[in-house]
């Protein structure tokens, strides 16, 4: 099981945008973990593949066509573009927080309780372990 990080946001990070586009790697001292040549440039997760312990409750909120899409791309040798969006106009993703270190990254989004660390290598590409969506009320 990968390490998990709590999501904590300062008040200024709650501005709403239809998608989130952030450079997550700009560090000259470490080489960017290999994305070039990776078979994965896009990760599309339909509703039935999202890991959620409250699926029956969540499915009442999220329609059958709900999905999360994550796009990856290199901007330059030392920066990586990460885009998180949804094809649904009613789902607006707010600005999140990113942490990246040698060999891994994690991200958070307002409303998510926790995210798991994900390794970035040329062989595994992004292994997104879990994105925990906002949970419906009990």
Curated annotation (Swiss-Prot):
Classification via Gene3D superfamilies: 2.60.40.1110
Pfam families named among the record's database cross-references: PTEN_C2
Domain C2 tensin-type residue range list: 1-75
Source domain of life: Eukaryota
InterPro entries noted in UniProt: C2_domain_sf (IPR035892), Tensin_C2-dom (IPR014020)
Protein name: Putative phosphatidylinositol 3,4,5-trisphosphate 3-phosphatase TPTE2P1
Organism: Homo sapiens
Gene assigned in the entry: TPTE2P1
């Amino acid at each position: 099981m990968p390490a998990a990080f709590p999501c904590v946001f300062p008040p200024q990070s709650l501005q709403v945008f239809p998608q989130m586009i952030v450079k997550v790697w700009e560090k000259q001292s470490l080489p960017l973990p290999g994305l070039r040549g990776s078979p994965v440039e896009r990760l599309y997760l339909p509703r039935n593949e999202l890991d959620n312990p409250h699926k029956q409750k969540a499915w009442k909120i999220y329609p059958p066509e709900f999905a999360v899409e994550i796009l990856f791309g290199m901007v330059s040798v030392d920066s990586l573009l990460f885009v998180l969006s949804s094809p649904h106009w009613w789902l607006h993703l707010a600005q999140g927080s990113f942490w990246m270190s040698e060999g891994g990254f994690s991200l958070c989004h307002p409303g998510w309780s926790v995210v798991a660390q994900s390794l970035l290598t040329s062989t595994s590409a992004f292994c997104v372990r879990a994105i925990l969506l906002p949970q419906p009320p009990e």
